[in-house]
UniProtKB/Swiss-Prot annotation:
GO biological process entries: adaptive immune response; immune response
Organism (species): Homo sapiens
Region (Framework-1): 25-49
Region (Complementarity-determining-1): 50-58
Function: V region of the variable domain of immunoglobulin light chains that participates in the antigen recognition. Immunoglobulins, also known as antibodies, are membrane-bound or secreted glycoproteins produced by B lymphocytes. In the recognition phase of humoral immunity, the membrane-bound immunoglobulins serve as receptors which, upon binding of a specific antigen, trigger the clonal expansion and differentiation of B lymphocytes into immunoglobulins-secreting plasma cells.
Protein name according to UniProt: Immunoglobulin lambda variable 8-61
Region called Complementarity-determining-2, residue ranges: 76-78
Domain Ig-like intervals: 25-122
Amino acid sequence: MSVPTMAWMMLLLGLLAYGSGVDSQTVVTQEPSFSVSPGGTVTLTCGLSSGSVSTSYYPSWYQQTPGQAPRTLIYSTNTRSSGVPDRFSGSILGNKAALTITGAQADDESDYYCVLYMGSGI
C-alpha cells in the first residue's frame, strides 16, 4: 500500500503566527511520501525549520481522501477524535509532532496534514 504525498499544511504561518513572536520565515519540515505494507507501522512527522514542536503548539492531524473534507484524527498532541481507530496515535518525537499508524490498512491511503497553533494574537 502506498501512502502518497504525506503533505502537511504550511500552517498559514503568516496568519497563525501573528503576534506570537514566531519568525515569519519559519517553515514546516516534512516528508513528501511514505509507503507501508498492510499491517505495518509508519510514523509521519511535522517539524519547524527553526525551533522545536512541543505540546504547547497543540499539534493536530487531519486525514483527507480525494473528494472528501478533511477528517480530524488527533488534536492536542495525542487526543483521538471520536470514532478514530486506536491504530492512530499522536505524540512528540524528539523535536517534532508525530502521527503513528500501527497496523496500517488499505483505506489509510490518504493525504495527512499537521496543524500547529502558533499564537493567540489574532
